[in-house]
Swiss-Prot record:
Cofactor: Mg(2+); K(+)
Record-stated family: Belongs to the pyruvate kinase family.
Gene Ontology biological process: plasminogen activation
Binding site for substrate: R56, G274, D275, T307
Pfam families per record: PK
Species of origin: Mycoplasma pneumoniae (strain ATCC 29342 / M129 / Subtype 1)
Protein name: Pyruvate kinase
Subunit (UniProt): Homotetramer.
Xref: Gene3D superfamilies: Phosphoenolpyruvate-binding domains, PK beta-barrel domain-like, Pyruvate kinase, C-terminal domain
Keyword Nucleotide-binding: yes
Binding positions for K(+) per the UniProt entry: N58, S60, D90, T91
Binding of Mg(2+), residues: E251, D275
Gene Ontology MF terms in the entry: ATP binding; kinase activity; magnesium ion binding; potassium ion binding; pyruvate kinase activity
Length: 508
């Protein structure tokens, strides 16, 4: 057992694998579904205890009532455990999907001609299928060219455009391989300048639903420009929801051309490697993943690595060694959070997937180069000019960093406690990658649940305003919070702990 509270956060996508086939709120109160309800609650409790701090709801699938069921279960369990859990709404966004196929799908053979209907909506048959998008107004005919590739189902089917029939709104292609496609599978048009609207009416309805359920994050699909972020921020401002944090999903070459601006305009970045790896050459994805992690650290923003991290665990118990290495080095490079998608949404072993990711994350943290972090990231971070950084963050990083020759040794501190509602202070403590977990004492419910993505940050809800605490009150509450997270982190022997009181570092 590695005895420290895991500081890298885990985002788990919630779907039927976790909350079973509970589709309506009424089902939660129906005795006929009592066993299913008990299993769903037990699953969510298991993953939260194993380090999940964010539940992601993918609004490309399911309706509002299904998502309301999941939110209720998560909130009930989080309250029972007295742990903060963030809710992330992942927008449908400007994506193109197969409209509808028969249950057995549509089998496409290599070298066959395939017709894509871009405006009519018909069930797929005879090598023809229709496409749809959330806006309902998009016409793919306007975005493709003869000779261009169209990738379907995460690239499992490759089509090449043979001709374009603008009169009948059809794209005629030649299949490059055999594959069976199914309803709602994604289409990608590599290097296309998509004319599809960034925010559809469906996206806005989904966001409105999320706001009524007090979501903490919006993961915005296919952000390509800073204007996309501004559009979303303006909408949130109009709904009195500026506190909701925006995570820009980077999924296209267009976005990479504007990446620094997008990072600065957003609250964080999701390296969405699935679609990104279809929109750009796959061998460039690791470079851009590394670049985005470094840039987010520099600009004091959050960064999430996502997609196929433990993909084999959808069907298997053991991860591949390549997957283990992938997760390990995402943490080692400075990620805030690692994400599970299909593994927990639809996989056969969702609880195991979370446990595996937890153990890899914790192992990587023991080898994290805290001295390099001090000498490079902290010396160059945009946050370094603040007084709080100079008086508190840098001294804490220096004090808690373990001695290192080849590997880390001499971890002396388990926790740092700070009482604050100041987001800039919380972000600075997270970005510093301290060699100790940071407990934030807060009386603000939005601060309490709003930091599930932030590396090393563990809020604890108190009644008093942080700035009103006396030193004795601060120490008393800090020790209560430490005991709470010591138990959650399965830390049998507590090491030293530090506090930040009126910007001075004190022993606890």
């Amino acid at each position: 057992m590695i005895h420290h509270l895991k500081r890298t956060k885990i985002i788990a996508t919630c779907g039927p694998a976790l909350t079973k086939k509970l589709w309506t709120l009424a089902m939660l109160d129906d005795p006929a579904y009592a066993a299913m309800k008990a299993e769903a609650y037990a699953n969510i409790e298991n993953i939260i205890k194993n380090g999940v701090t964010v539940i992601r709801l993918n609004f490309s699938h399911g309706n509002h009532e299904e998502q309301a069921v999941r939110i209720k279960i998560v909130r009930d369990v989080a309250k029972k455990l007295n742990l903060p859990v963030s809710i992330m709404l992942d927008t449908n966004g400007p994506e193109i999907r197969v409209f509808e196929t028969a249950p057995e799908g549509l089998k496409i053979l290599k070298d066959s001609e395939v017709v894509i209907n871009t405006t009519t909506k018909e069930v797929a048959k005879n090598n023809q299928f229709s496409v749809s998008d959330a806006s309902g107004t998009y016409n793919m005919v306007n975005d493709v060219k003869v000779g261009q590739k169209i990738l379907v189902d995460d690239g499992k089917l490759s089509l090449v455009v043979k001709r374009i029939d603008t009169k009948n709104n059809q794209v005629i292609c030649v299949a490059q391989n055999d594959h069976t496609i199914f309803t709602k599978k994604r289409l990608n048009l590599p290097n296309a300048d998509y004319s599809i609207p960034f925010l559809s009416a469906k996206d806005l309805r989904d966001i409105d639903f999320g706001l009524t359920h007090q979501i903490d994050y919006i993961a915005a699909s296919f952000v390509n420009t800073t204007e996309n972020i501004k559009q979303l921020r303006d909408y949130l401002a109009s709904k009195n929801a500026k506190h909701v944090k925006l995570i820009a999903k980077i999924e296209s070459n267009h976005a990479l051309n504007n990446i620094d601006g997008i990072i600065k305009a957003s609250d964080g970045i999701m390296v969405a490697r699935g679609d990104l790896g279809l929109e750009i050459p796959y061998y460039k994805v690791p470079y851009w993943q590394r670049y985005m992690i470094k840039a987010c650290r520099f600009f004091n923003k959050r960064v999430i690595t996502a997609t196929q991290m433990l993909d084999s665990l959808e069907k298997n118990i053991q991860p591949t060694r390549a997957e283990v290495t992938d997760v390990y080095f995402a943490v080692d490079r400075g990620n805030d959070a690692t994400m599970l998608s299909g593994e927990t949404a639809n996989g056969a072993f969702p609880l195991n997937a979370v446990y595996v990711m937890k153990m890899i994350d914790k192992q990587s943290e023991t080898f994290f180069d805290y001295q390099y972090n001090l000498n490079y990231y902290m010396a160059n971070s945009k946050a370094r000019h603040s007084e709080f950084w100079k008086q508190v963050v840098l001294p804490l990083a220096q004090k808690t960093a373990p001695k290192r020759k080849l590997i880390n040794s001499d971890f002396k501190y388990d926790f740092v406690v700070h009482a604050t509602n100041n987001l800039n202070e919380i972000y600075a403590l997270s970005n510093a990658r301290l060699a100790a977990a940071v407990i934030i004492l807060t009386n603000d419910p939005q601060v309490y649940t709003g930091h599930g993505v932030d590396y090393g940050i563990f809020p604890y809800l108190i009644d008093q305003k942080p700035q009103s605490l006396s030193k004795a009150e601060f120490k008393s509450l800090a020790n209560v919070a430490i005991k709470h997270y010591q138990q959650h982190g399965e830390i049998s022997q507590l090491k030293q702990c530090l506090g930040v009181f009126h910007n001075k570092i004190i022993s606890l």
